[in-house]
Regions:
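A short glycine-leucine-enriched loop at secondary-structure breakpoints
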Residues: 9-11, 299
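Conserved phosphate/anionic-ligand binding catalytic regions in large, soluble enzymes, centered on
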Residues: 46, 70-78, 82, 331-335, ...
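Short Cys/His-rich metal-coordination motifs, predominantly Zn2+-binding knuckles/fingers
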Residues: 9, 43, 78
Length: 359
């Protein structure tokens, strides 16, 4: 069992029709007095969860089969990591530090305290002496209210969030190429694609439910999988092409792929002519790259890059997925642009089973 690929996600216990496989939390669900549909907060997949509770305590979490995102599946954390909700060390009231010690206070008191302090700093040092930092774990509405509070109540533009670091390269790169910074396709489009390219992402660890779907795709013999990552990730074990480039050479490797797509005559000429701009200048730049230098920089054999490029370009439908290994880098925006350019060169945009998808 230890040597297997099992990650103890609990899907078998939920699916077993005879309860021969079960878990202690699932059996407790019969004691629940309330069931609530909610969304998992651990990663960005957005799995739906059915939470069974009694007297405010979580007894069991199951994955509903009618959920479009996860379709009855969830990871080990989504299903089992919930004891902290009712843990005795969890804060259940606001606290103010007095004489070096945190003391519990009422909500009315803490609101008065915050309003007084923020008002003092704003009046004494000016609005720009205050800054707000929001979070990707907040809802869209909460983030909107946070920036509205900082801008209109405090009177400053000093508002930031963690997504600026991890997602802004994707938003900017895709906006420059496609006009919008969102994923172009649904994860369900894996059912309609023939090839996936995963670059700078380890979804079986970071996005387990999506990663499981990608792994299922990669394990099928009639599908093509390309993994571009310095590490031998779980998906790399099943990939047809694993390009283990040196860290920081994403742009160089993608330039090599586009070079071979152009020189092998694999571009979608009609798509490029009708849907893109500036191709002639782009082609001239790509054809003038120094393959010897790029091969040396990336540490990847050019023939391996060529084979992966041909596999991507010749697939009837090809999807790409990229993660923080691409975006949290000084070349993040340029790499996203190159990934988008690959899709444009081969016409892999604008229909089911294709596209560029940030994780």
């Amino acid at each position: 069992f230890e040597a297997s690929d099992c990650v103890s996600c609990g899907a078998c216990s939920q699916a077993c029709p005879t309860s021969a496989i079960s878990d202690v939390f699932q059996s407790k669900a019969i004691e629940a007095t309330k069931s609530t549909r909610t969304i998992c907060t651990y990663c960005g997949v957005g799995c739906n969860l059915e939470v069974s509770t009694s007297n405010g305590e979580i007894l069991s979490i199951q994955a509903p089969y009618d959920a479009e995102v996860n379709q009855g599946h969830t990871c080990i954390k989504g299903r089992y990591a919930f004891k902290f909700y009712n843990h005795q060390d969890r804060l259940d009231s606001p606290m103010i530090k007095r004489n070096g010690v945190f003391e519990k206070v009422s909500w009315d008191e803490v609101y008065d305290y915050l309003a007084s302090k923020l008002g003092h700093f704003r009046d004494e040092f000016g609005p720009d002496s205050i800054a707000g930092i929001s979070s990707a774990r907040c809802t869209n509405e909460e983030n909107y209210l946070m920036q509205k509070f900082i801008r209109t109540v405090i009177g400053t533009n000093n508002i930031d969030g963690c997504a600026r670091v991890c997602h802004s390269p994707t938003a900017l790169g895709m906006q420059r190429t496609f006009g919008t910074g969102a994923a172009t396709n649904s994860i369900d489009d894996l059912n309609d694609t023939n090839c996936i390219m995963v670059i700078g992402a380890n979804p079986t660890d970071a996005h387990p439910v999506t990663g499981a779907k990608l792994k299922q795709f990669a394990m099928k013999s009639d599908h093509v999988s390309i993994v571009i990552d310095p590490r031998r990730t779980e998906l790399a074990k099943y990939a047809n092409h694993h390009l283990a480039l040196r860290p920081g050479t994403n742009v160089a490797l993608l330039n090599m792929m586009m070079y071979y797509i152009i020189t092998e005559g694999l571009i979608d000429s009609s798509f490029v002519a009708s849907r893109t701009e500036g191709y002639d200048a782009f082609q001239n730049e790509i054809l003038n790259i120094d393959l010897d230098a790029l091969e040396s920089v990336t540490g990847v054999n050019r023939e391996d890059v060529k084979a992966a490029a041909i596999a991507y370009a010749t697939a009837p439908n090809a999807m790409s997925f990229h993660g923080l290994g691409v975006t949290e880098h000084s070349q993040g925006t340029f790499t996203v642009i190159q990934i988008a350019d690959l899709a444009l060169l081969t016409g892999n945009i604008g229909r089911r089973g294709v596209g560029v998808n940030p994780l």
